[in-house]
From Swiss-Prot:
InterPro entries: GCR1-cAMP_receptor (IPR022343), GPCR_2-like_7TM (IPR017981), Methusela_ecto_dom_1 (IPR044860), Methusela_ecto_dom_2 (IPR023311), Methuselah_N_dom (IPR010596), Methuselah_N_sf (IPR036272), Mth_GPCR (IPR051384). This is Probable G-protein coupled receptor Mth-like 12. Disulfide bonds join 27-81, 83-88, 92-189, 93-104, 155-209. It comes from Drosophila melanogaster. The keyword Ubl conjugation does not apply. The chain crosses the membrane at residues 216-236, 248-268, 284-304, 316-336, 374-394, 417-437, 455-475. The gene is mthl12. Its main location: membrane. Glycans are attached at residues 19, 34, 55, 141, 365. Keywords: Cell membrane, Disulfide bond, G-protein coupled receptor, Glycoprotein, Membrane, Receptor, Signal, Transducer, Transmembrane, Transmembrane helix. It is a multi-pass membrane protein.
Length: 488
């Protein structure tokens, strides 16, 4: 028994030692460089006239990409924490410029020149000097400031600073004079566009929050995509489901499928070369899905309230023209905005910035209400009005024909069939509306740092990811649909 316990403890110690050797204390992976082929002199490695002590080195059997994911390497490589011996500063890289190997292809140089104060963040926190005292401290002129690349994050805030509004410290931290706030070099990054007035004016990206994809979300999204595919396959293969209402629903489901498919492909980093194009497509299909459901709600209202049961020959063509053209208009608008003002940080608050924070449209600040949230609110409000009007009409008709139910069972059966169709689409509408509402509440909670890591917030995230599964269960896994499939 004692021998087994001894072996177990030895195994734990060896495992801890192995894991600890793969990391350098108080040094992030992106602050290290590969020094496997550099000379070792005494107890240090020489890199471009800089000495990296052996205690700032470690062996890594993986490569960490810009998005934080880790890729195993064929052989372990020795890395040294260069930012402990040389000033480093981060410059953000747009998602569309990140290559498959984790490098950034926006052409920004590896070094920049900045005047820095001969103090560290720790010195400022300990002494708490005034601005006048800071001006008397010698400056640290660095011509070899190493550039670290980091991708944009949701909730990032672009801030423009004049020369007298900031001070760069020699450890890469920045002191903001107006707010007396100190940001460490991993709490901000520089905007990738360096202008002629640099460094008299710099533009920094203030990290307001970090969003990490929760465990299982990607897998749920893959299953949702499969759910959309199966639902579409059933509707396309069963002739009774391909009436005008069914065709509109097929188009709506296809739009939602494309939206989820693009998000899933983006998560697995399969859109490297077409990130911006995929972002515009995702926005286009997102608008299309809500427009198609507005068409469905309008058609249901017209179907129930109109005395003329004859469907116009070109009605579906009219619906198609309306939806796709209407969705294309805001897509062209945000594309034009990005093309004209993308390189102007002063207008960044109003830009959708497709391809910067992901292969999608920026949708968390106030300006996103104009090209994302307000159109969806209008469409959802229209859907509510249509469904309420239809419900009122059905209630009145059922009340009116109740006394004639025994005399004309055929009309009652027809009415019951239409009511069941209506109820089915009401359920679908409620799921879509609830999904959008939960998504907005999730973003609001994250941005306000409310309900973070709570069951309520986590549940809404998982429900949104599983939307394709809910659609499949609602529309396919029921007796009437199975009966149509068997009769096909």
């Amino acid at each position: 028994m004692f021998l087994w316990l001894k072996c177990f403890c030895t195994l734990i110690i060896v495992t801890i030692a192995k894991n600890s050797s793969a990391k350098i204390p108080h040094c992030k992976y992106d602050e290290t460089i590969n020094i496997s082929h550099f000379k070792r002199l005494n107890d240090a490695y020489i890199y471009e006239h800089f000495e990296i002590p052996a205690n700032l080195t470690g062996e890594f059997d993986y490569k960490e990409l810009m998005d934080g994911s880790k890729v195993p390497t064929e052989f372990p490589n020795l890395r040294g924490c260069i930012c402990k011996v040389r000033p480093c500063i981060r410059i953000c890289c747009a998602r569309k410029n990140i290559l498959s190997n984790g490098e950034c292809s926006d052409g920004v140089k590896n070094e920049i020149k900045l005047t820095m104060l001969d103090l560290t963040m720790q010195d400022i926190l300990l002494t708490d000097p005034t601005l006048a005292e800071l001006n008397m401290i010698p400056q640290y002129n660095s011509t070899e400031l190493l550039i670290l690349r980091e991708q944009f994050q949701p909730c990032d805030e672009i801030v423009s600073l004049k020369r007298d509004e900031y001070t760069i410290l020699k450890d890469g931290s920045i002191l903001l004079h107006t707010s007396a706030e100190i940001l460490s070099n991993d709490q901000y990054c520089l905007y990738p566009e360096i202008y002629s007035d640099f460094p008299e004016t710099i533009r920094i990206i203030n990290r307001r929050c970090y969003r990490n994809v929760m465990p299982g979300i990607a897998q749920l999204s893959v299953i949702s995509v499969v759910g959309f595919i199966l639902t579409l396959a059933v509707y396309l293969s069963v002739e009774k489901l391909r009436n005008l209402l069914g065709k509109c629903l097929i188009c709506s489901l296809f739009s939602m499928f494309m939206e989820y498919f693009i998000w899933t492909m983006d998560y697995f980093r399969l859109l490297q070369s077409i990130c911006s194009a995929a972002g515009y497509m995702k926005y286009f299909f997102s608008m299309s899905s809500y427009l198609w459901f507005s068409v469905v709600s309008f058609h249901l209202w017209e179907l129930f309230t109109s005395l003329n049961r004859h469907e116009p020959q070109y009605r579906f063509l009219i619906y198609n023209t309306f939806v796709w053209c209407t969705a294309a208009i805001p897509t062209v608008v945000i594309f034009s905005m990005n093309q004209m003002w993308e390189n102007d940080p002063g207008k960044s608050e109003w830009l959708p910035l497709v391809g910067y924070f992901g292969c999608s449209v920026k949708d968390w600040n106030s300006s996103s209400w104009f090209y994302s949230h307000i159109p969806i609110v209008i469409l959802n409000s229209f859907n509510v009005i249509m469904f309420v009007l239809t419900a009122i009409y059905i209630w009145k008709v059922k009340k009116g024909v109740k006394s004639f139910a025994q005399h004309d069972e055929r009309n009652t059966t027809c009415l019951e069939f239409n009511v069941q169709t209506y109820i089915q689409f009401v359920r679908l509408f409620l799921i879509m509306g609830a999904s959008w509402l939960l998504d907005q509440l999730t973003r609001l909670a994250e941005d306000s740092h409310l309900l973070l890591d709570t069951i309520v917030l986590n549940l809404t995230v998982y429900l949104n990811a599983a939307f394709g599964i809910l659609i499949f269960v609602l529309l396919i896994l029921k007796g009437s649909t199975f009966k149509m499939i068997m009769e096909r």
